[in-house]
């Protein structure tokens, strides 16, 4: 099976399948999609912004029920109040099912924390908590 490229040239079947990319920043997600489309076939690409209605944990809880999702990639600037524990529980369940969760936490430096606060109003908290 091949996928057409914008140039019209067919692309061979991609080896990686079943990736769910869940990102708090839309620009990060678009960059990821642009770079990964040569390597993996995304199953889901979700940008959730400031998490006013639906949190990162809600998305992971939903996606963990999809057996076609085999790898989870999460970019997070900060948790909503009380959501960190729910996130950890979801990650543990997913990892316990044999599926990896790749986690990139923004805000490791003072400058990164300031950028996250101005972008999605996230209080990034201590980076060490997420390690």
Locate the predicted segments by residue:
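Catalytic-core regions of core metabolic enzymes
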Residues: 1-131
